[in-house]
Design a protein with these regions (language model features):
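ATP-binding/phosphotransfer module of carbohydrate and carboxylate kinases, centering on a glycine-rich
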Residues: 1-7, 21-31, 47, 53, ...
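General beta-strand structural signal in soluble alpha/beta enzymes
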Residues: 9-14
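Active-site-adjacent loop/helix segments that line or gate small-molecule/cofactor pockets in enzymes
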Residues: 15-19
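Short glycine-aspartate micro-motif
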Residues: 34-38, 44
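Short secondary-structure boundary segments
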Residues: 39-41, 140-141
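A short acidic/small-residue loop/turn micro-motif
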Residues: 60-63
Length: 194
């Protein structure tokens, strides 16, 4: 591939590619620490910090942080390892199993999105406390439900409860944001020819 493209080629996870794209071409340009979380058929995350993608011993398993279930939520969770992790409770298949319909068909059901926002905000609170990102970008099919963003921001602020006070957290609309590059056209780019 390197010979055909005349440039270095590497492989990584899709979400690391997403966070790198946002830092390089998108709304996270100039940020030193950014987290990208995709919530769709599963949940995955990429972390960019001080010019590098975070790998550690493996890639971050951000979808498997444990969540405290709401008492009224009788859904067991679908993750075969944890049941009550973010992916097991909040990914698209979990929404469909819990409510009996796909997320796209539940847009007008506020109870669905209140619960979803609560679980996502719990996970984001953990990431804020441990990763300390300057921006959190949310992508994936579930996040196409635009009503989720204000609900997540509100719950995240409640969960942080004033423990951390920063300019970023004071401006939640620019702190927890939707992915920006999915709607960008790349027709202006020219690939090398052989």
């Amino acid at each position: 591939m390197q010979e055909a493209l005349h440039c270095p080629v590497g492989f990584d996870t899709d979400v690391n590619g997403s966070v790198l794209g946002e830092v390089t071409f998108g709304q996270a340009q100039g940020k030193k620490c950014v987290m990208y979380l995709t919530i769709g058929t599963g949940v995955g995350g990429g972390i960019y910090s001080n010019g590098e993608l975070h790998h550690g011993m493996l890639h971050p398993e951000t979808g498997h942080v444990l969540i405290t279930k709401r008492t009224a939520d009788t859904y067991a969770g679908r993750c075969p390892y944890h049941k009550n992790c973010l992916e097991g409770l909040a990914a698209g298949p979990a929404i469909e199993e819990r409510w009996g319909r796909k997320a796209v068909d539940l847009a007008d059901c506020p109870e669905v999105w209140e619960l979803e926002a609560d679980y996502i905000a719990q996970a984001l609170t953990g990431y804020v406390m441990t990763v300390s990102p300057e921006m959190i970008i949310l992508g994936g099919g579930v996040m196409h439900q635009e009503q989720l963003f204000p609900l997540i921001r509100k719950k995240l602020k409640e969960y942080i409860n004033g423990y951390i006070v920063t300019d970023e957290l004071a401006d939640m609309e620019h702190y927890v944001v939707p992915a920006s590059l999915h709607a960008v056209s790349y027709t202006h780019l020219t690939l090398p020819t052989t």
